[in-house]
């Protein structure tokens, strides 16, 4: 664990969830990189609320904490591309741009564990792959986190504003 990514205030996975996601260390009761978990929670909630640009910013600000070649970097960079692709699709109706970003996201997410920091990465990869042929699969799709599909509240939007 790196000291610059520690944060004891970051909550553990849901206690009623029957999985231990990659990134959670049950022996220490901490996330390997708590700031990554915080960015994941915020970024997923914002994405699921349709705030794709803000979601992108959450993942991007965390991505810079990791050196290239690490799983953390690949995951964060992939999620940046996921949010940017959705932004292109929904806000600009630019499906060619979406496809380009999703193809890059799939490259980054290729070797990331299927359940990384609570995100159902397998579902993300499957949805992106399907969206390359049929962008309408994104309509109503939300990212699963800890077995749920949470949305943003005022706290997440306030955090995103502070990133700008």
Question: What is each stretch, according to the model?
Answer:
Residues 1-164:
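Acidic, polar-rich N-terminal leader regions of halophilic archaeal proteins
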